[in-house]
Amino acid sequence: MTPVTLRPTTPADNEFCFQLHKAAMGESIAAIWGWDEQRQRASHTRKFNPGHWQIITAGGIDVGMIDVEYRPAEIYLSRIEIHPDYQGRGIGTRLLSALLDEARHRGQDLVLDVFTINKRARALYQRLGMTEVAPHGDGDIRVTMRSARRHP
């Protein structure tokens, strides 16, 4: 099994993260709003957070990024994106399983939001035991998902 590790982002990762976002999420974004390169790049520039986001590496290759917020009552998975060339290899499952274990150990829920049309991601989250809580956004474009809280 290929080792999966995380490293903090640096300013040098800005373009990698934008291109990753385009490859991993571009189809969903285009289906919902249409892909506007300038608007997406401006949004990315506002949100890019070196040192807080983490780069996912598999076998020493940068394959994705993850952003996790540790809140007082929950762990919130703000973003996980894996390049399509590396999807389906268990990388996301391993990272999500580790977050679910950490949430259980803390006595907290893992919470995330996912595009409603992203059926593949929703199926993965459900397979790992997360449940859909509530759709939201204009036209219910996203759904909040939550793990069942289990105390250690």
What are these regions (language model features)?
Residues 45-55, 64:
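A short helix-loop-beta-strand connector motif used in the catalytic cores of GNAT acetyltransferases and
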Residues 4-19:
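A short beta-loop-alpha structural element at the N-terminal edge
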Residues 44, 125, 130:
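Conserved active-site tyrosine of GNAT-family acetyltransferases
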